[in-house]
């Protein structure tokens, strides 16, 4: 890709996750799930809103809940790679949630290059597989049927457990990262995934990616994660019903990660992006 251009901007208050299929963008907005037609990015169209899909964070103090807020000023600060988390608010000027969602700016270019399906990374809460959207709330996996984009419907809700954070599909399975462990579900039946196994760890934030019967999980400390561990775990999935830890590697404050052909890319807080050769799981090599 050469010379990428900013051709538009959609103002979606409090949005943290998106997925795209057939030029329909699905996103969270506060507690709601919304769908926007982006066939013409200069003239996007609001399609539908499903209310109260997500929970609003109650803050980092377990003994207090957040019941509201006021925006008093705008503060711009640099953010260290990997420090963002889905359980906190960043207050910026924004339109009220009941106002229509419209492009803020765009170029005259009418073309678009959006793909036909959504692809999520290690921090994604959304995943589109065929005609279904999988969405994680803090305790549930919710499945939506996208065959009718004008009126997509909830197909199933599967209660998983507390602290769900990320979803990663691989080889007809779903790998769910939570603050207490990794859950594995068989997804051959797209509307009724079946539980296969879990791998437990201490309470910590937990993105996950998978390749070649191995899962790569980062654990990090932080105010929202309430954990004390900062490490990369490599997990053996040869027996998918009994995942086993191969080895843990200490890190600074790891967050998102990606893998391709045994090369692992890992965002490690203030130390930035790190690249590892993970051909040998028990002896990974730092590349740069």
Regions from the language model: what does each represent?
Residues 1-288:
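Feature marking well-ordered beta-strand scaffolds used for ligand recognition
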């Amino acid at each position: 890709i050469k010379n990428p251009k900013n051709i538009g901007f959609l103002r979606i208050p409090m949005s943290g996750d998106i997925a795209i299929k057939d030029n329909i963008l699905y996103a969270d907005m506060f507690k709601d799930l919304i769908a926007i037609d982006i066939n013409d990015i200069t003239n996007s169209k609001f399609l539908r809103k499903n209310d109260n899909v997500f929970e609003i964070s109650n803050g980092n103090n377990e003994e207090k809940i957040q019941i509201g807020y006021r925006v008093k000023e705008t503060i711009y600060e640099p953010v260290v790679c990997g420090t963002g988390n889905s359980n906190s608010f960043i207050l910026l000027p924004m339109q009220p949630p009941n106002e229509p969602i419209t492009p803020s700016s765009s170029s005259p270019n009418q073309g678009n290059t959006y793909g036909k399906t959504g692809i999520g990374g290690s921090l994604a809460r959304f995943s589109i597989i065929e005609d279904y959207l999988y969405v994680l709330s803090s305790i549930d996996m919710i499945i939506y049927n996208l065959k009718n984009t004008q009126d997509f419907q909830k197909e199933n809700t599967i209660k998983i457990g507390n602290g769900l954070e990320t979803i990663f599909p691989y080889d007809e399975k779903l790998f769910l990262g939570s603050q207490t462990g990794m859950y594995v579900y068989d997804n051959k039946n797209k509307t009724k995934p079946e539980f296969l196994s879990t791998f437990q760890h201490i309470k910590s934030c937990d993105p996950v990616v998978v390749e070649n019967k191995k899962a790569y999980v980062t654990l990090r400390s932080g105010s929202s994660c309430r954990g004390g561990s900062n490490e990369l775990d490599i997990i053996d999935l040869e027996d998918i019903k009994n995942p086993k830890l191969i080895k843990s590697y200490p890190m600074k404050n790891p967050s998102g990660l990606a893998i391709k052909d045994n090369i692992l890319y890992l965002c490690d807080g203030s130390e930035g992006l790190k690249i590892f050769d993970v051909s040998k799981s028990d002896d990974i090599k730092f590349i740069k």
